[in-house]
Regions:
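Loop-helix junctions at membrane interfaces
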Residues: 1-124
Length: 124
């Protein structure tokens, strides 16, 4: 999304999540992973738009918090009401920190790669 268009980046995020979930057997169920894949599209799309407007730090913060906290809670709500899973707050307590840290690491890596490609004058 930050190297290519936000829409294409979002589609890549969506498909990447589905492929990883498929390889692990959709451990939280197919409906949950479809929701998470759609959330990946949204977070990559929004983060890319903010990044491409030159607000790199804001993009990192928004992407990290949206993916790590916001969408984790939304997924917890979905699991609770649709699938009868654990309380959404407990789901967030369980997964919020590790997913937020993973999101931060992924976003920092994407920003570094983007800067490296830009400095090397490589266009994708």
């Amino acid at each position: 999304g930050i190297i290519i268009s936000p829409v294409v980046g979002g589609i890549i995020g969506l498909l990447a999540h589905l492929f990883v979930a498929l390889r692990t057997g959709f451990p939280l169920s197919l409906p949950v992973h479809i929701l998470v894949a759609l959330e990946m599209f949204v977070v990559v799309y929004i983060t890319s738009i903010i990044f491409n407007r030159g607000k790199v730090i804001l993009a990192g913060i928004v992407g990290t918090l949206l993916n790590g906290i916001g969408f984790t809670f939304i997924t917890g709500v979905f699991m609770y009401f649709v699938l009868g899973g654990m309380n959404p707050v407990d789901f967030l307590k369980l997964l919020g920190l590790p997913l937020t840290l993973a999101s931060l690491v992924n976003i920092v890596i994407a920003f570094i790669v983007s800067k490296g490609l830009k400095n090397a004058n490589i266009q994708v």
